[in-house]
Amino acid sequence: MNIAIVEDCAEDAKVLKDCIEKYAEKYNEVCVVNVYTDGVQFLTEYKSDADVVFMDIEMPYRDGLKVSAELRKTDPLVCIVFITNMRQYAIRGYDV
């Protein structure tokens, strides 16, 4: 399984990556996890190969909702999981 994490906070990205890797080890899954530090880097480097994208919403340069809308144009079937601590963004995520 290919997983992308788009998260500007290095500590949060590491925690999520560690959780994914522990899950993969526990259930004998092969997971390749790529971490992107912002939405611009992600859109520039992404090769439409992820099964799941964990997307932070509040990021510099371009927020995760805008990045996800761009992603949908090139990869309409990828699963996007929004990660945020800001309740006001929860409903807006369903639009993407």
Label the predicted regions.
Residues M1-A4:
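Non-catalytic signal-transmission and effector/linker regions of two-component phosphorelay proteins
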Residues E7:
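Conserved acidic carboxylate
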Residues A10-K17, A90:
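Charged phosphotransfer/docking patches of two-component systems
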Residues V15, C19-K26:
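Alpha-helical interaction/dimerization surfaces of two-component signaling modules
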Residues D18, E29-C31, S48-D49, I57:
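Surface-exposed beta-strand edges and their flanking turn/coil or helix-capping segments
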Residues K26-T37:
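Short hydrophobic/Thr-rich beta-strand motif most characteristic of the beta2 strand and flanking loop
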Residues V35-Q41, G64:
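Helix N-cap/capping motif at the beta->alpha junctions
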Residues T44, A50-V96:
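CheY-like receiver
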